[in-house]
Structures are given as C-alpha cells and as structure tokens.
Amino acid sequence: MGKKSRVKTQKSGTGATATVSPKEILNLTSELLQKCSSPAPSPGKEWEEYTQIRALVEKIRKKQKGLSVTFDGKREDYFPDLMKWASENGASVEGFEMVNFKEEGFGLRATRDIKAEELFLWVPRKLLMTVESAKNSVLGPLYSQDRILQAMGNIALAFHLLCERASPNSFWQPYIQTLPSEYDTPLYFEEEEVRCLQSTQAIHDVFSQYKNTARQYAYFYKVIQTHPHANKLPLKESFTYEDYRWAVSSVMTRQNQIPTEDGSRVTLALIPLWDMCNHTNGLITTGYNLEDDRCECVALQDFQAGDQIYIFYGTRSNAEFVIHSGFFFDNNSHDRVKIKLGVSKSDRLYAMKAEVLARAGIPTSSVFALHSTEPPISAQLLAFLRVFCMTEEELKEHLLGDSAIDRIFTLGNAEFPVSWDNEVKLWTFLEDRASLLLKTYKTTIEEDKIVLKNPDLSVRATMAIKLRLGEKEILEKAVKSAAVNREYYRKHMEERAPLPRYEESDLGLLEGGVGDSRLPLVLRKLEEEAGVQESLSLTETVSKVKAAENGLVNGENLIPNGTRSENESLSPEESENVTGEESSGSMAKVKERL
C-alpha cells in the first residue's frame, strides 16, 4: 500500500549499542504511563495534554536514538527477494511488478492485460503473519500470560512483527524488509502538522491515537523488562518507542481479517505482496478461499499492461484514511463528516419520540454522518430527523392505529414525507446545525485553498489541510442541499399539495429512498454513519464465512486497514486505558482497562 508508505531509507542491519540504561527509560516510561492514564482532559484542554505527552515521548525518543533495528539499503532493494520468497511458497507472482508511482508511493503495475474479475493474485496462509502465528512464535510464552496481548490482536501482531524483524533468520524477513521504515500516520506528524488539524472532527481521534500508543508503549516497556516470559524475546535489550510506533503503524495500515483454518472464527493478518496494492473507488474484490486456504484477489476492472493495479479498501472517510492509513484520497466517493444528534430528555414529547425511534430501530442519541454525495443524509438520519421534528399528533399517528406500522415502515424513505411542515422543519434544522459546525473552524474554505498552493508545505501538512478543507466542503454542501430541500417542501406546503401515501404495491420504491435502504429501518451499520468501522460481530462474521458458496470471505468489513472482530480491536488508538498493573484478571477486565 504505497500511498501510506512514503519512506525514508533504512540504514543499518542491527541495533546500535545502548547508551542509556533500561532503568532510566523505565523511570521515564513510568512517568509517561501515569500521564497517559489520567482522566480525560476537560474540553479545551486536549491540546495541552497532547503537548505534555508529546514532550515526554520526545524525551524518550532522544535518549533512544540509534537503538532501533533497521535494514541496510532501500526498501525496493528487497523486492526481488520478496517475489522469490512468495513464489517459492505458493503465491502468485506473474502478471504484475512492484513500481514506485511517485505521489502514490509503491504499488503493483500490470505486466500483461488483466480482465475485470480475473483472479490475478493469491497468497497462501503460510505466508501470512497472523495472531495465530504469533502464538506459535517466540512471543507465545508471553502471549499465554499477558491478557492485553490476548485481548488485542492488533497489539499481538505488532509485537510479532517486531520480534520477527529482530530475528535475522525469520521466515518472514523477505516480507518485513520491504515494509516502509516510517509512515504518514498522525503518529509521525510533527507538532505543527498536527496543529493543522485543530478544530477538525479528526483531531480528537488523533489525540486519542497518540495518547493510547504512548500508554501502550510505556506499559509494555515495563512488561518486557520485568516479565519472566519476556526474557527470551529479541526485544529485551532494545525496545524503543520508535520501534513500537513503526510496528503499530505497519499493522494499522495493513491488517486484514481472515478466517482461522477451521473457519470457525476470525483472526488478524498481514498479507505480503497483496498489501502493496493502492486504493481507488470501487467494490471489494478480495476474499479468503477456505478450500485452498489462501487469500485471493480478483481484478476490480480491466487493467492493461503498464496500468497500476488498484483495489478498493472499503467505504472509508478521508478522516479514517488519514488517521489509520496515512493518506488522503482525492475524490473519495465515501467521504463524510460526523454529526452528533439526540432527543433531549427534557423534551416534552421525549417518551413518544423515543418509542417511535425504538420501533424503527434507531437510538434516541447517536452519531450520524453527512455525506459528500447526494443526498447528503442516509435513510437512518432522515428517519431520525423526521421523528425529532414531529408534532404530538404526528407521533400519535406513528404509534396508534392500523396505519402506524406502515408509517414506521416509510420513516426513512424520501418518497413518503410525514407532512410538508415536518420536512420544512427537519431541513431547516439540518441547515442550521451544519452552519453551526462550519463556524467552529478557524479558517475558511478559501483560506485553506490558498495555503494548499504553498510549494513548501510538507506532505503531512498537506494531508491535514486537505482533510480540514474536505470537512468544510461537505458541511457547506449539506447547508446548500438542506436549503434547497427546505424551499422545495415549503412550496409544497404553501400549495397544499397532497401527501403521497404508502401502499404495499410501493414496496419497490423503498429500495430507492435516501441512502438506498430497505425499510423498515433496523439499527444497521451506525458505524458508517459515525464514520467509524465498528467491531464486526463475531457470529456475523463466522456466518459469512460459512455461507460463502466458494469459500471466500468477502465483504465491506473484510478490507485492509480496518476490520474488527469482537476480541480484536484493530487500531491501537482505539484501546482505552492501559494501566501499569500486572497482566491478570478476566478478559473483560482487561478490555475495560484498555
């Protein structure tokens, strides 16, 4: 995944001799752990906390300078070894080559014509680095004792990667040597580059990512220095923050979810070769073939010899791409911003609104999304706004009588308004809310566009400003769209136009409403509304595995850089509080601490 792989040349094949004592670092990491485990700061104090944590991290990094294990030469020097290793172990290596595409970084280029839906790439399980292979590695003894590693597959995978990188004879060395030496995730941003994200919706996730990564490093530094099962780890003599940041980013930008060998559950994996593919808009074309026990990818479209081969990572917003993958995707057809809405409990009609929403499968308070495409809202949000703006009489119509179920059934469909007045109210409310969100930014759209013309702007600052600009453009578009809809329905109200009524024969219309949803509404994929890919239900995932006719696991959540299972939170920044306590207790308690 070259776009998130802008690299600096790696310089040495071994770790340098330590110039700082483990005890000194242990004292600093204890201070860092205490700072990162403090209660969340009050609103307006997040930046202050971030800079304090960053100062401690930078102090540790300075003392550890030169201690990390790296490799001689450039990343691309190892590509031939990767291809040879992949070929010898059953992966496909014909029809493509690894090339530097400049702005997009390294990716795959077709060396022959490839037809759409043609199977062109497969990687057998033995080549994958997984949580399962971590358990069977030198990390196994510590994994068996540490509840945090057991509860968080992404962290286990990061340590697996670090241990194998530090082992010259590792089976995965041909793969690890081709990984970037650094990334463009916010963990690598300079303070001024992070400052470009201030006032954006993404900044809170950036703060959380940085804080949690620092907390995890501090916790595991103590574990590695003091836990008896860590004695044989190749990290014992040198485990730097730089190492951990690299491993976390490598996993965060590349991880994917695959079924275990028996297909009964899912596990996290790094997939060599395939993870070189860059992203474009489209559909998921990668799955897992249980019969042949390999990851398979079919072509997203026709590719001619010389074309870059793209895959689709999933319906990610640009905030997700920047934070978890380290790149901004121009013309992202799935870009969106979050909007938090809820019915106030002080609302006189709260009980009735809550009941209508419950029947539609919608919570009284949630995070929805405003989309970059038309319409800017989904069926879920439309239904919520309609209920939010209902009069007492309209609420009664949705709760009582023979037609109540039909009214619930059509709540999220644009073809069947509750009333013209209700439509005017909801679009007016949305227009006002989006306008207020726009006013929270410290710069205007025009100012951001001017800044982006600066040729001296760093790659990461450019990403940050593009993200900031993109959020505002989506909000501005939502304001304009809401205004148009408001006037459209106001005209209908003034003209006393008859309301369309639902009949069973109209069922086909329900698939073409806002968000192209099938109603009645159920609480589905609110993570998409929030712009966050939430945890896949384990049972849901397993059922997908078993139901796949050809043994492929494929779908929106089975994508690089962000699939989840119940027991495996994908991105380290999403973990909550790591404490300095010894690893013990139930898995549930560990998850609460993390």
Swiss-Prot record:
EC number: 2.1.1.85
Residues that, per the record, bind S-adenosyl-L-methionine: R75, E104, G105, F106, R254, D275, M276, C277, N278, H279, S325, G326, F327
The keyword Transport is annotated on this UniProt entry: no
Gene Ontology terms, MF aspect: actin binding; histone H3K36 methyltransferase activity; histone H3K4 methyltransferase activity; protein-L-histidine N-tele-methyltransferase activity; RNA polymerase II-specific DNA-binding transcription factor binding; transcription coactivator activity
Taxonomic superkingdom: Eukaryota
Bias kind Polar residues: ranges: 10-20
Region annotation Disordered: where it falls in the sequence: 1-22, 551-594
Catalysed reactions listed for this entry: L-histidyl-[protein] + S-adenosyl-L-methionine = N(tele)-methyl-L-histidyl-[protein] + S-adenosyl-L-homocysteine + H(+)
Pfam families, A to Z: Rubis-subs-bind, SET
Transmembrane segments: none
Main localization of the protein described in the UniProt heading: cytoplasm
Keyword field: Actin-binding, Cytoplasm, Methyltransferase, Nucleus, Phosphoprotein, S-adenosyl-L-methionine, Transferase, Ubl conjugation
Disruption phenotype annotation: Mice are viable, but females display severely decreased litter sizes due to primary maternal dystocia (delayed parturition) that is refractory to ecbolic induction agents. Cells show complete loss of actin histidine methylation.
Quaternary assembly: Interacts with MYOD1.
Function summary: Protein-histidine N-methyltransferase that specifically mediates 3-methylhistidine (tele-methylhistidine) methylation of actin at 'His-73'. Histidine methylation of actin is required for smooth muscle contraction of the laboring uterus during delivery. Does not have protein-lysine N-methyltransferase activity and probably only catalyzes histidine methylation of actin.
PANTHER family in alphabetical order: ACTIN-HISTIDINE N-METHYLTRANSFERASE (PTHR13271:SF47), UNCHARACTERIZED PUTATIVE METHYLTRANSFERASE (PTHR13271)
Notes concerning its domains: The SET domain specifically recognizes and binds actin, suggesting that it does not accommodate substrates diverging from actin.
Name this protein carries in UniProt: Actin-histidine N-methyltransferase
Name of the gene this protein is made from: Setd3
